[in-house]
Amino acid sequence: MIIKLIFLICFKIVLSIDNKTKFNETLILDNIDYWVKFNDTITLDSNITSEIEAVSWNFYNNTFNLLAICGKASNFCSCSNYSTSFFNITNNCSLTIFLIDETLFNTTYQIVYSTNIINYKINLLIPVTPPIISYNCANCSINCKKSNGTNTNIFLSINDTIVTYTNESILNYDYNCSILNNNFTVTCIINNTISTSNTTEFINCTNILLSSYLDFFQVTSYIFYMIIFIVTGITVSILISIITFLFIRKRKHVEEIESPPPESNEEEQQCHHDTTSIHEPSPREPLLPKPYSRYQYNTPIYYMRPSTQQLFKSYSLPKPCPPPKPCPPPKPCPPPKPCPPSKPCPPPEPYSPPKPCPPPKPYPSLPSIPLPPDIPPLSTQNISLIHVDRII
């Protein structure tokens, strides 16, 4: 055991001294990729054929770090400085990895011996899920995209015939529009070493021309409605401007007509002399037209006298009215006429006794009705009085 430790120490010293000088002379033997599931175990072969060899295992995590130092003699390999929780080294100096931690994946493990270097990259293998199919009838293209999974292969099948495949994440395929019909079935298959999945879709490109026409008509209708909206807005703006201009012009004309002409001083003096009397026009006085009404433009034109225009000034205040005349005192009411004396009541008429009633007249005797000879007397007949009355 002591001899083994001395041999390993000497090997480490020699390796550290000659590593820089021999590194440029080493030959990279191979780069190998492994796709492994979580919780699996993998063994990286050392490929050592000589009887006596010095071996070192490294792992790459941004930089290469020493994992273990081994020495092989005959069929025995002794190593040190490695974690037995995740790793184990066989008698051939091969490295066994227990993939129970995610940090062990996507890592490169390197073995160095003699003048050879082998790089092993461990990748995590994820199961696949159904792919996604998309197509464009106008460009005659089909796309098949991976949704999930690692180390995958994608196959494209048209009408149950595989036409192309790839190991990339997306498969693009341009088909011949003149050869294929407008209706066909597309199947996209994706798989890896642990799972497989597929998606099938029926493609119908018969209505591509109709859909393009519909898109054109839709855009045209949008443009048409936009033009109508713009033209309508411009027309309404022009009409509002014209109506506003005519209204302002008409109002200005009415104000010019309603404004009174300048009056002379004689008319003012005359108004001061007698404000209560109304000036009677003379036959020679001109008559001015009455201003137009703002609400009735088709009514006949009336004329007013010049002297009365002073009464319609908007800025002149009316003269105060004279005080009202006092009301005359009310006339006294005449005395009421005396009532005439009441007439005496006439004496009551004397009561006359009622006349005695005359005695009742005797009823006439009933005539005797002779009975027929064949009818027996009433005493012998069994006839009720009611029946007799009915017979009578």
From Swiss-Prot:
Localization annotation? Host cell membrane; Virion membrane; Host Golgi apparatus
Segments spanning the bilayer are 223-243
Segments on the Extracellular face: 17-222
Question: Which Gene3D superfamilies is this protein grouped with?
Answer: Immunoglobulins (2.60.40.10)
For bias type Basic and acidic residues, the affected ranges are 269-283
Membrane topology label:
Single-pass type I membrane protein
Q: Which first-to-last residue range defines the signal peptide?
A: 1-16
Q: Which residue intervals make up region (5 X 6 AA tandem repeats of K-P-C-[PRS]-[P]-[PS])?
A: 319-348
Modification after translation (UniProt): Cleaved into two fragments of 63 kDa and 26 kDa containing respectively the glycosylated N-terminus and the nonglycosylated C-terminus. A full-length 89-kDa glycosylated form also exists.
| Cytoplasmic topology ranges | 244-392
Recorded GO CC terms: host cell Golgi apparatus; host cell plasma membrane; membrane; virion membrane
Q: Does the keyword section mention Transmembrane?
A: yes
Keywords associated with the record: Disulfide bond, Glycoprotein, Host cell membrane, Host Golgi apparatus, Host membrane, Late protein, Membrane, Receptor, Repeat, Signal, Transmembrane, Transmembrane helix, Virion
Q: Say if the entry is tagged with keyword Disulfide bond.
A: yes
Residues bearing glycans: 39, 88, 92, 106, 148, 159, 183, 191, 198, 204
Disordered as annotated region, ranges: 258-290, 328-357
Question: Which residues form each disulfide bond in the chain?
Answer: 137-205, 144-188
Q: How does this polypeptide assemble, per the annotation?
A: Both glycosylated and nonglycosylated forms interact (via C-terminus) with the host AP-1 complex.
Function (record text): May play an immunosuppressive role by inhibiting lymphocyte proliferation and subsequently facilitating viral replication and generalization of infection. Responsible for viral hemadsorption, which may help viral spread. Increases virus replication in the tick vector at the step of virus uptake or replication in the tick gut. May play a role in the host Golgi reorganization to yield viral factories. May play a role in host cell penetration.
**What is the protein name stated in its UniProt record?**
CD2 homolog
